[in-house]
Amino acid sequence: MKSKPIAVFTTAGSLEDARKLATTLVEQKLAACAQISEIESFYTWDKEVQNDQEFRIMFKTTKDKYKDVEKAILKIHSYDLPAIYAVNVDELYKPYDDWVNESIK
């Protein structure tokens, strides 16, 4: 039985770091695909509001791969406290879902 599709997100401080994360997880078959977008983030750190340019990486994978994806991100991430979260995908075009599952076997 196929595992449920999820999208896992994290951010990186540079395009180089984002590309390293994306390439590594796809090469390790932890994600079928990774997409990188430039974003502007606002957050509180050390009791002060921060504003940084970052790169969001979205990994297309399955629920049964989440823990391995999280471990792989933590192993190479440059942040002390990276945001790593998953979103369930309730509906997905079946041929694409098949491709995701096949790509991470």
Language model regions located:
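Positively charged, small/polar-rich N-terminal and surface patches that mediate targeting and assembly
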Residues: 1-105
